[in-house]
UniProtKB/Swiss-Prot annotation:
Binding-site positions, NADP(+): 49, 169
Other facts: Regulated by TRANSPARENT TESTA 2, TRANSPARENT TESTA 8 and TRANSPARENT TESTA GLABRA 1.
Transmembrane portions of the chain: none
GO MF term set: anthocyanidin reductase activity; oxidoreductase activity
Gene: BAN
Full protein name: Anthocyanidin reductase
Amino acid sequence: MDQTLTHTGSKKACVIGGTGNLASILIKHLLQSGYKVNTTVRDPENEKKIAHLRKLQELGDLKIFKADLTDEDSFESSFSGCEYIFHVATPINFKSEDPEKDMIKPAIQGVINVLKSCLKSKSVKRVIYTSSAAAVSINNLSGTGIVMNEENWTDVEFLTEEKPFNWGYPISKVLAEKTAWEFAKENKINLVTVIPALIAGNSLLSDPPSSLSLSMSFITGKEMHVTGLKEMQKLSGSISFVHVDDLARAHLFLAEKETASGRYICCAYNTSVPEIADFLIQRYPKYNVLSEFEEGLSIPKLTLSSQKLINEGFRFEYGINEMYDQMIEYFESKGLIKAK
């Protein structure tokens, strides 16, 4: 693995998991920045799932490769000639009855397989791994005004003992990221991890990604997503957002920033369940908004700090108004919400 960060000729990057929401927006930003881009998908024959990638090919040199996180040997061709590897994909199965088998072990093995492939590459200079705020903010601390930064890790022992709603996902993100750091240090891989809050804003996908469905649940009224958002605050202590375009820009920014190192929280806005409902009622009066919640959700316990990222020179472009304006527009365009 090449440790220098100087460019030679055309810049080239690989985005793992191109069918995802963040991955597709990241690919768009890379192409618009002059990169040649390779992306991996599990099934390149599924035209519905890669339709947005076909459209993105109009922006520049985008090649689609078949690869699977469970198969170490499937990444070699997609990594060829790439300076940066963006490991955005993660196994998600919230309906699983065996999260260890379906999420935790595949996430860990996927990280190892990707990093092993990077070691074999002669071109890879830096790996950017997408972690999650779920790897930082979940604990049994009490009180309010808690500030979480990159030094904090989610309490896996607490999650294992209590097994709260969707407990497998945060454990998978913690253990996968820690595995990435251990492997990178042992093998001298230049690794940066990005820790995003709940991803909001627009989408290039034909079906709404789960993060947008959660964010819009007080308007759609979908019980599963309403429960998910409320449980997120109970577990994490707040609801924190980042716009998908800001998050994609942060990935590219940290790839190219020579001084970047370690973990970076990427969060633009910290709030709570009732505050979201109040905001939606005021800004979008033509929609029915769920606004009755149990006690204990009114005050956010903690905030996620992006100060380290800001200190590197990054600036967020989108606030909560723009995030929700774009989600409203997206859901309206899909016929998923109706006015009163």
